[in-house]
Structure formats: structure tokens, C-alpha cells
Amino acid sequence: MGFYENLAAQSAPITVAPESTSYFSESNPGLDPRLFRSEQLIGTVRQDILGLLFNHLKAHYYNPEAYTHAWLAGSGVSFQWAAQRDPADLDCLVGIDYNSFRRANSQYVGFSDQEIADTINDDLRTELWPQTSHYLGVFELTFYVNVASDIRQIKPYAAYSLTDDDWVVEPQIMSAPTNKKWEQLVDRDLAQGTGIVDRYTKALTAIEASKNDAARLNAQSALKLAVQQGAALFDAIHSGRSLAFSKNGLGYEDYANYRWQSGKASGLIPALKTMKEISTKSRQEFESQTYGMTLPDVKILIRRALRYNN
């Protein structure tokens, strides 16, 4: 099966439909009772999440307890936890003492802090995330290593230390910023993204209705372009949001976070994320059929070379 055939096979109807988000929801008077008793994390939840994380890390790295700190962070541990989303978001952020990591894992001596974080995140994303996509039946629990070892540097809504069983950034009553210029900009995102989804839908319909090779190839080319554009817009919005929660960003009140959250509320982000996944899966399927394996990107190859040469 060629690339275009793989792309069409991975594609399915996509809609842009509004959904509830915590960012634009009213603050609750208390924290999520599925996780907290008063303002203390339920002990069994804390131990379970730490167990999931460290069991995974021990399978790949030596002595992770010596250099790893873990927090629950974001809307899931804030007063804005009650948006009607299924599953609800729950983020476990991981800090690494990189010098201690290198001492315990000598094959990573030549790695930068960013390369170590990327390596661990690759493993977390492919191996641990699928196990925790419906944690406790209600949460999408994700694990992510930040290059910054101190979580306060990324300005989270709130952060609870799983390691120390205490708050590092206590939750506050917050509400989304109001800014007419920002509203105009996100409306432009929605118009652009909806146009991409419309072209995607038309191309998919044209492929199914095509009666000759030329018509099918034209429709497949249009589908490929729409998927590429959707994936690129998703990456642009997502990377901006990542910068919002960095040392130089403004966190909750950053425009890039507002842009991301507005896209989630309008349904644009889920639609673009689906297009990004279609792009990735069709490429991987084509590579697997052509080369017998999925080809790693250049950054992964460099990290592997560094590891094996140390």
C-alpha cells in the first residue's frame, strides 16, 4: 500500500464541535473529591501514581528514587477541575536532578539535560501513557519530564508534590482573562482551522466517490495537503502553549495558553490533534510496510548514538 493509500485508510470524518474546558469554567469551592480530602491528596492515590512512575523508571534506569521528584499539576489539582470532560485531565510532572541521573546512568554522560528529558519522555509516552489513559476510570493521567527541575519555574496553575506530600504551588481562585484582541485572534484560528477541516472532508468524500485514477490522485493530494496544514496549525498552537509554561512565559494568563484553551473550547484543538495523529500514523504505517520498521526521527537517532557510544 502506498503513502496516499495509507493516508486515506487512516482518515475518518472529523468535526469541530464545542466542548467544556476547565479554563473557562467557574471555580469550585473545593478540590476534586476523587483526589483530595480537604486539601490533602488521598494517600492511596499518591502511592499508586508514584508506583506507576517508579516501576516504569526502574525498568529503564538505575536508582530513579535518587534523582526524581514528581508533582501533580494543572487544572486537575486546581479549583477549576469540574469541566464536563471524559476523561478529565490529570498531569504528573517529573523533575530530574540531571547530574545525579548521569552518575547513576553512565551511558547518558554525554547527553544534555534536554536530551535526557526527551529520552525519558519518549519512553513515558509510548509505554506508560497507554496504561493510564483512563486512570481510576475518570482521568487521562499523563507523565511528562520538564527540563526545569523546579516546577515553580514553569508557572503551573497549582502543583502538589507527590514526593513530599505537600503543596508547592497552592491553588487559587482564578478566572480566564478577558481581552477583545485575543478573542479576535482566536476567532481567526477557528476560521482557519475550520477551513482546513472542510477541505479535508471534501477531499475524503472525493476519494470515496472517485471513479478513475486521476480523480482519486487529485483527491488524495488535496487530503494530504489538508492533513499537513492541520498538523502544522496544531503544532504552532501547542508549541506556543508550551512556551507559556516556561521560565519566560506568563503561565495561566499568557496569550498562548488562552489561545490553546480557546481552541479546546471551540473543538478546534481536538480536530487538529486528530489530523496530527492521522499524519503520524499514516507515515508510520507506510514506513513499516516499506522498510519493515518505523523510522525514528533524527533527534532520536542522535540520542541513541550518544547512549551506545558511552
Q: Could you describe each region identified by the protein language model?
A:
Residues 2-11:
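Extended acidic low-complexity intrinsically disordered regions
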Residues 11-87, 95-310:
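Catalytic core of pol beta-like nucleotidyltransferases
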